[in-house]
Amino acid sequence: MAKTDLSKVRNIGIMAHIDAGKTTTTERILYYTGKSYKIGEVHDGAATMDWMEQEQERGITITSAATTTFWHDTQINIIDTPGHVDFTVEVERSLRVLDGAVAVFDGVAGVEPQSMTVWRQAAKYGVPRICYINKLDRTGASFDHCVKTIKERLHAIPVLLQLPIGAEDQFMGIVDLVEMNAKTWRGETELGAHYETEDIPADMKDEAEAARAEMLETVAENDEEFMELYLEDPDAVTVDQVKAAIRRGVLASAFTAVTCGTSFKNKGVQPLLDAIVDYLPSPTDVPAISGFKPGDESVELERRPCDDEPLSILAFKIASDPHLGKLTFVRVYSGVLHAGDQVLNATKGKKERIGKIYQMHANKREEIESIGAGMICAVMGLKDTTTGETLCDQTNPIILESMTFPAPVIEQAIEPKSKADQEKLSNAIQRLVEEDPTFRVHTDEETGQTIVAGMGELHLDVFIDRMKREFHVEANIGKPQVAYRETLRKPVEKYEYTHKKQTGGSGQFARVIIAIEPKEPGFGYEFVNAVTGGRIPKEYIPSVDAGVQESMQFGVLAGYPVEDVKVTLLDGAYHEVDSSEMAFKIAGSMAFKEAARKANPGLLEPLMAVEVTTPEDYLGTVIGDLNSRRGQIQEMVEEHGNKVVRALVPLSEMFGYVGDLRSKTSGQASYSMEFDSYGECPSSVADEIIAKANGGK
């Protein structure tokens, strides 16, 4: 494979709120760059990027397919990211391997809640962004309102590269404030592939000059090098100098460059492509990736995006291709990967052999022999590698920092209809969990049912849909249930438990004394061994820890997992003959269970951040309804003539909300919801949940 000039590569993501036109924008990019010969519309379920059947039916993007295309002499690798909040893990996962992103906003709504979530995620990974204000042909679209929401809701500094020419159905092009010309799309033929570059319309000259002056001023304020040129003579700065300064500012996330258009009507996409090339980073513009030595996190290592550095790769997505089987999408951070190479999975300490390497165009593929640093591709043949794991050179191992995934908040029981379905279900679960680590699966100890947990109702719907459609599992599906947690509210300084069993022959004996201490939310679990003088032999300590953790999976109130606790093993005793790992595991488990009863246990429920946008006429109804659902109103603001109510509401109260809201507001209000945190259940609610959980026992 010919060596790629990395300065001519852009690894980008296109991110947005659901329905902002992200998939349509990606489709147009693929069309104008010559990769897609018939434009696919989300409206008719034919979009090239949306390649799973459910996506085509639902008109939303669920998996991030990676595709490679070219604009002039620059290679653009695009990761398509989902806009629905249930799939934020897909977004996190793709942002992890991107160098830059395009945030697409709806020209009518401006910055919406999911846009804010994704923006925060991009900031967390330090991904430079440019904005594209889409759908400016729609009734009610307002470029100025969108720019205002970028300032107010994202707390970003927008630098306008363009102004729209014409509004709503009269929208016909853009004023380019960098080059100071107009680009117009007049005919509907050729699907917008050609546009005219002409003088700025006379009635927009003053507005354009004022906007350009403001743009140059903002850039100068954030770039010292440009400031000197600008102060010397504002009229003498060249287009190249302006572009270079904007590029530096975007790469430093000092400000965000703003473009506009209407992808559906084929206007404004080519200048967006130019902006991607001009202002978003190449792999050489981003810092070297850091990691650590396997087995010793204190030894920090770095890899630069060079072909002659040792190989380091991050697996960021696993997908099942109906023809090829399991495909692993990877980003090569350093070194060169060849088909047939043996590599080390440093996360698991296992060797893997690379099969074929593909560059993907949505769901079409091109086989290649090798791929260098800074590139994204899909590989076959990996048996043990899952999302977030590192593959590397066996002689220079490194683990790149992994991704952290949120805990699921909603679960559903699945009962296969026959023994054959049980086997198919096991296979389906293994494959689907491998693809998306935010699905968690466990077996209910009492009922024997398989419980699947996920990030929201749509998330579980898609899981069950794929299980039936791709793996042909016939099953009865239970109602979605809330994933409660248990917590401890007071410390227990000392609790002693002795496990003793004598049934002829060697018996079982283990004595442990533990202390338990509740910790702050998000702390997780910590086990401290404070045993001295060999009172419990070293080899039995991990068994006590394992017993405690096993017991924590089933809390004493209602059998939900216990969170945020520190357990200290203080002392104990053993017997030369009768003690064993199993005896200490049982002792650890029972000691925690009994001590937890004395630690004032409480029930936690997932609280969702809910944002409702409603006409003022229905504001009272919406607030009253949220209050009746135990919602805590956080704030109310006015946006675009509507009222926006933000509240924290328990997930258990939100089932069926979409239908209720629609009927109470005649379909005029909309809402979005995402997980916020776990909060304590009021005792009246907790008593009911506990009684229900223990009722069948």
From Swiss-Prot:
One of its GO terms (biological process) is ribosome disassembly. GTP binds at residues 16-23, 80-84, 134-137. PROSITE patterns: G_TR_1, G_TR_2. The keyword Lipid metabolism does not apply. One of its GO terms (cellular component) is cytoplasm. Keywords: Cytoplasm, Elongation factor, GTP-binding, Nucleotide-binding, Protein biosynthesis. Signal peptide: none annotated. It is found in: Cytoplasm. InterPro entries: EF-G-like_DII (IPR053905), EFG_II (IPR041095), EFG_III (IPR009022), EFG_III/V (IPR035647), EFG_IV (IPR047872), EFG_V (IPR035649), EFG_V-like (IPR000640), G_TR_CS (IPR031157). This is Elongation factor G. It comes from Cutibacterium acnes (strain DSM 16379 / KPA171202) (Propionibacterium acnes). The gene is fusA.
